[in-house]
């Protein structure tokens, strides 16, 4: 009887092609031992051959660095949004390729931001869209696994609600209080407390990542059988200052505490209003005025490992050392000045109230 590994590698042309790609990148020494360990894990858990193959695809893509997606079959699935996109199939699973945005000053780093942001979320245990860096016909892309399957519909937060809520859409300007009201009012949500917790935990991670574009259209729910479940986190291309393309400017910012602080305390702001205005992540979190936010901070902050995040950044071979240092600098300062500061302040208040 053949093992799962022998079944997968022997019978599946796509798997064999991924093996060839990984070997061409001199990853055989890493891939081999890791794959056997992965096989033993899945067999112990009694996974099927299909589950093994799908897992193996992720295993190889994560270790193969920049992949060339040019020759993968098209999925012929259309995607909206402002960025150029192409749908492809990897081992019969649909992926969306997002292209690097062009500006008069060069290419934006939205693809790298998408990749880093998604992987940070996954490091922290959030359900998040799988992403892989690569190229397509010579252009830089990030491959994002499509999590919309048959019978499942994505419903953005902007569109969630009962008819009674929809009638009041203009009233809801998506302040924090309004978000709470909307979530509590929607009786189709399967677990309202969990959804509320997840939203505020996502906000904490977005604060670390300096996400300037989390809005009611790029987070929401999966609808199946008329029930709503929180969707995986996706659309992280606005993290970590993707418009910053000038390395001389990066160096100036890193050498100037005032410039760093502007990018910590003042911008980017979140897209959700606080007291009628766009809110600074620092203002909202450090105010400690939202109990749900405080609980999210306690839940998320202790699990943030900057060392692992920096290792992830160091493995990206399409950005310079200056650019990597810029990412690390901004993450370090946002971690210390927004999250750690607020966490210490919160725990101090809790101790005083004991």
Feature annotation, model-predicted:
Residues 1-204, 208-210, 221-354:
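Phosphate/dinucleotide-binding and metal-coordinating scaffold of catalytic cores
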Residues 215-216:
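Canonical protein kinase catalytic loop motif
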């Amino acid at each position: 009887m053949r093992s799962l590994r022998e079944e997968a590698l022997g019978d599946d042309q796509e798997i064999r092609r991924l093996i060839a790609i990984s070997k061409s990148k001199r990853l055989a020494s890493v891939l081999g031992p890791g794959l056997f360990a992965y096989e033993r894990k899945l067999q112990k858990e009694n996974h099927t051959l299909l589950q093994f193959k799908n897992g193996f695809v992720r295993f190889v893509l994560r270790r193969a660095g920049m992949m060339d997606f040019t020759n993968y079959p098209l999925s012929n699935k259309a995607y909206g949004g402002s960025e150029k996109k192409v749908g492809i199939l990897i081992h019969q699973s649909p992926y969306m390729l997002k292209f690097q945005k062009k500006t008069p000053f060069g290419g934006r780093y939205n693809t790298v931001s998408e990749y880093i942001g998604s992987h940070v979320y996954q490091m922290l245990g959030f359900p998040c869209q799988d992403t892989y860096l690569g190229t397509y016909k010579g252009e830089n892309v990030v491959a994002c696994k499509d999590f919309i399957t048959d019978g499942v519909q994505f419903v953005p937060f902007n569109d969630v609600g009962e008819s009674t809520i929809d009638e009041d859409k203009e009233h809801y300007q998506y302040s924090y209080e309004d978000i709470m009201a909307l979530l509590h009012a929607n009786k189709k949500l399967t677990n309202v407390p969990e959804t509320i917790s997840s939203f505020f935990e996502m906000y904490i991670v977005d604060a670390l990542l300096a996400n300037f574009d989390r809005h009611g259209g790029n987070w929401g729910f999966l609808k199946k059988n008329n029930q709503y479940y929180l969707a995986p986190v996706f659309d992280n291309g606005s993290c970590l200052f993707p418009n910053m393309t000038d390395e001389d400017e990066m160096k100036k910012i890193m050498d100037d505490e005032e410039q760093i602080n502007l990018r910590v305390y003042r911008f980017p702001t979140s897209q959700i209003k606080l007291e009628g205005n766009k809110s600074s992540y620092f203002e909202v979190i450090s105010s400690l005025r939202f109990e749900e936010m405080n609980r999210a901070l306690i839940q998320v902050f202790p699990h943030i490992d900057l060392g692992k995040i920096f290792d992830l950044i160091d493995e990206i071979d399409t950005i310079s050392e200056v650019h990597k240092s810029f990412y690390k600098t901004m993450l370090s300062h946002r971690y210390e000045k927004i999250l750690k500061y607020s966490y210490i302040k919160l725990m101090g208040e809790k101790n005083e109230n004991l």
